[in-house]
A protein has these predicted regions:
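Generic structural signal for well-ordered alpha-helical scaffold segments
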Residues: 8-11, 41-49
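Structural core segment of the AMP-binding/adenylate-forming
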Residues: 78-124
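Conserved AMP-binding/adenylate-forming
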Residues: 29, 46-90
């Protein structure tokens, strides 16, 4: 079994079992394996169809700690892509250097970082 199979198998074996709780959300986000796998499948499908992410492409994520990182990690696993987590505590200039080094095909970011992403976009 590889990482891309994990959530799909968990959905088969225990679809209604609580898989994850994101206590950082208001209200608290609780997902079963079935819900979580389908959520990750939607992201993987979007990455593939819209962002044209494929095998060995890098997908960068700029977000605070939360389920979004795990969604991205498992979606990348389903596609054979490389999950590239960016440290949200870095200054946008440091993130530019990381992006130039890793060359991600797409950057996923949370609304908290829209100003930084605008600066990053201008700099690249």
């Amino acid at each position: 079994m590889y990482i891309g199979d994990y959530l799909g198998r968990r959905e088969i074996y225990s679809p209604d079992t609580l898989a994850i709780i994101d206590a950082g959300k208001a209200p608290e986000l609780r997902l079963t394996f079935k819900q979580w796998n389908r959520r990750v499948n939607r992201l993987a499908n979007w990455l593939s169809a819209t962002a044209k992410v494929g095998f060995r492409d890098r997908v960068a994520i700029l977000a605070r700690d939360g389920i979004e990182h795990l969604d991205s990690f498992y979606a990348c696993g389903k596609l054979g892509a490389i999950h590239t987590a960016l440290n949200w505590r870095l200054h946008w200039r440091e993130i530019v250097a990381l992006i130039e080094d890793t060359q991600p095909k797409v950057l996923i970011y949370s609304d908290d970082f829209i100003d930084s992403v605008r600066e990053i976009e201008k700099a690249i």
